[in-house]
Structures are given as structure tokens and as C-alpha cells.
């Protein structure tokens, strides 16, 4: 049998037998509150476009204007000729807004997280991560030369037991956890890190733009400034890409040694141009965050009495079903009633905690959230 074929077929068969096979659906307007699939319209509660910017016409025009000025692609890595005024302006906007000296741009949050850990850590270092951190962080930690330890989710007492008297320590947590929608106790984590002379890195992919009075995210809300902040542009910014924010020396270090940065083509300058507009929109259009608060109250009022309901202060609303088959059954029943929700199953979440990952956006109406509630209750009642 040709190389790798047996392994590939075996893995695919096992995934299918476990009922965990995944597939991609071709949808139209997946970045809007109403999407279309195979000729039918659904209310979309699966998008990470929390502030509703992905299809905002002002942002679309900004990208189009960027295209007219800069063309389509950057043409090179940022260390060659791929770094334009648009990239520089985006970095400046981010640092001024979030209060850091440097911002280093990346093509995705996954690459930013991996670049950070692979570049910063050495064999003598200790990496301490929340056990529910994103796969990009866990993979990079496992593959790095540093010793990785994991603390129980949001458990400060357990975190305190993992420090040693040797080596540099880096504590890494998400600001908002993508599958549970809960926030890290950043003030407590930051204090523990400070007392242990450790650095703190926060991946705020799901908090930036959504939390805080000016949309500064989890750190603004907690009044905490970590040594390193990772923000991504694929959620509240309505686009894609990411940035690592840090002090000047760390920024220079990453610019020189982060291979994901040095050896990747820079993001299109038109994208950077539009992202700079998104930064302004996030700060100035507080009504988008206010809308999320309103929708959260409607969601909670209508569903908090049901088993599986999880209370969160973020737009991420996990509804825990338990078994994978039942989660799929509920998701499919909701779709029959015109509601698009996604069942999240192992290995993304632990076995026995399969769930619907429901997300609210500023483009939803209160009536749409009420319609979701009715459909979900009907689906659960049919189990």
C-alpha cells in the first residue's frame, strides 16, 4: 500500500465510527445574521462577527479604498518590501489604543500564538498555561523546548503551585475562552505572575472589541496590562489577521527572530488599511457593545431555566447537551426550524460535554433571539 494511505484511511474510518466526522457547508452570507444554504435562509447564531463589522458597508468601502491605493497583495515579507504605510498606521493605531509600545502583525491568531511561544521560550524556561487554552497555544507549548505545565481552568490556587525556583516563567491564558464564553480572572492571574516575577501573556481573541468601555477587551475590563497581549482580527474586527502587542525590546526581538513573521508574506496592505478603520469603529461605535448587552439579557431571560444553560457575560453562549449524537440531533432540529447553530464535539471539547456554541452579534435583533429560544426549547423537548 502506498506510503501514508493506510494511516489516513484508518484515521478517517475511526473518526466516522465515533460519530465525530466533520464537514464544511457551502453557505452564502455566513458573516451576516441571515445566511443561505442550499436555497434556504437561516438565522445565523454561529458567527464570530460579534460587533457585526464583517459586512458593514463603511468597512467594505475602506477595504475597497485600500485596494485602489495599494493594490491587492503586499508582494513580499515585511522584512523585504511587504511593509507599507498601511501596516505602519495599523500598528500605530493598535499601540495607541491598547497602550503598548509595539504591535507586530501576523496572518492569523494561530500563527501569532505559535510565533510567540516558539520564539520566546528556551529549554530552561517554564510555560504555565490554562488547560483550556486554544489549540495553537497548546501545540506550540508541547513542541517548544520549554517545560510546559497546565493549571486547572481559571484555578488560581492550582496556578500558584506550578512555579519553580529555576528558569524564566511565562503564564499564558485566554481572556475569553472560546468554547465556554467565560472570562479569565485576569487581575488575580496578573498578581500571581507579578509576585513570582513571571511574565503574563493574554490571548484576547474573543474579548478584544467586545469587552471594556472602549472595546479594549478583557485586559481593559480587568484593568490589567500583561507583558504580552495577542489580539486577532477575525472576530470583533470583522476581518482576519492578528497582532502581538508588547514593549519595544520584545517587539524588536520578535521582528528579528519570529519565523512566522520573518518568512511569511505580509498581509495585504488594503487589509491593513481597512483594519485601521475597524480600530476606529470599535472605539467610537459603543452602541455595538450596548446591543450585545441587550441581547444577552433577552437570551438569559428566555433560556436560563433550561438544563444545559450556561451563564456568560460575553456573546459566546455554550448550551451543553452532553453526548455528541444528542448535540447533533438538537442542532439539526434547530435547523429544521430555520436556526443555524453548530454542535461542538470532541476533540474540541471534552467527552461528555458536547454542546451548541451559540454566538450573539450586534446584527441580531431581540426578536431573532426569542425565535432561537423557541426553536431550542422545541428541539430539547423532542429528545
Swiss-Prot record:
Q: Which EC class is the enzyme in?
A: transferase
Give the domain of life.
Bacteria
GO terms for biological process, alphabetical: biotin biosynthetic process
Q: What's the catalysed reaction?
A: 6-carboxyhexanoyl-[ACP] + L-alanine + H(+) = (8S)-8-amino-7-oxononanoate + holo-[ACP] + CO2
Q: Which residues carry this modification: N6-(pyridoxal phosphate)lysine?
A: 235
The catalytic activity of this protein is classed by the Enzyme Commission as 2.3.1.47
Enumerate the residues binding pyridoxal 5'-phosphate.
109-110, 178, 206, 232
Q: Which residues form the signal peptide?
A: none
For molecular function, the Gene Ontology terms on record are: 8-amino-7-oxononanoate synthase activity; pyridoxal phosphate binding
Coiled-coil regions listed: none
Q: Which pathway does this polypeptide act in?
A: Cofactor biosynthesis; biotin biosynthesis
Please give the function described in this protein's UniProt entry: Catalyzes the decarboxylative condensation of pimeloyl-[acyl-carrier protein] and L-alanine to produce 8-amino-7-oxononanoate (AON), [acyl-carrier protein], and carbon dioxide.
Q: How does it assemble?
A: Homodimer.
- The protein here is known as 8-amino-7-oxononanoate synthase
Q: Which gene encodes it?
A: bioF
